[in-house]
Amino acid sequence: DGSLSPTGKLIRQDSPTWLEIHPNRRFLVATHELSHHTGVAEGVGFASSYKILPDGELEKVATQSTGGRGNTSATFDRTGRFLLVTRYWESGISVLPFDPDTGKIGEVTASPDHKGSGPDPVRQSIPHPHGFLGDPQTDLVYATDLGTDKVHQYLLNTNTGALSPIGEVALAPGSGPRGMKFHPSLRVAYVNCELNGTVVVCSIDDEKGLQPIQTEFCYPEDFVARGHPENLGRGEFWGAEGCLSADGAYYYYICRVHQSIAVFKVGPDGKLAFSSRS
């Protein structure tokens, strides 16, 4: 009937900020942020892995340092053999090997730091990688950086876990790219921007990566942003997650502050047309 019930077991770990299920559905990985925002500021941030048992309970498998304290998000590359982690407060990203048979996490194989800033002196004084994910069809990986208004593009060596930069995609100043989703059947990606309330539609070239083809404002045109409490009353937008329906027919953008979800119809070329708001 869709109701939820606890399994009865509670696993305690310091400040788990992100949960990601492996594509084989056998393991769950958590990243742990150690910062003043979580109240646990000492030590080194890490990732932990758990085996998902038949009754839904979790059995801890391993922990591994990510090389930084500010872990924000994590995903798996298309092979399922590498964990891609953002280090929001350290301005970088990390790649860690993952064994899909045992659930064990290896030591960091790549950990580049980003450079630069954006026009917002509070939110963009330094780089802030927020999303890091792999292309579903190639070995390209992308890091959305809220602090620099760029999507950093890399080629992942799926033998060694090394990263080779292949360029950056610059978005509008002050946009604050937060995350990205891939269309399930089109070679199109959607970058949701937190600071200016937009989604950027990008075509994907298998070698060159992203090319922006459309930008849509997701808040009502007459909405005056009142600002999130952490924005010090400066009146920004505070866009949150963006996602696609399972069939790729619709794109959804969460409009924080306005407390709504913007719904867009996805066209045959991947471009968006506003449909409704809920």
Functional labels for PLM-detected ranges:
Residues D1-G2, Y50-G56, V95-G106, Y154-A162, ...:
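Short loop/turn segments immediately following beta-strands, especially the blade-tip
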Residues S5-I11, E59-Q64, A110, G116-V122, ...:
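A short beta-strand motif characteristic of beta-propeller blades
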Residues P23-R25, R78-G80, D135-T138, P184-L186, ...:
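Residue-level detector of Asp-centered blade-edge/turn motifs that repeat once per structural unit
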Residues A30-L34, G39-A41, V85-Y88, D135, ...:
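Conserved beta-strand positions in repeat-built beta-propeller and related beta-rich domains
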Residues E59-G131:
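Asp-box/WD-like beta-propeller blade repeats and closely related beta-sheet repeat scaffolds
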Residues G235-G270, S275-S278:
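Loop/turn-rich, solvent-exposed surfaces of beta-rich toroidal or solenoidal domains
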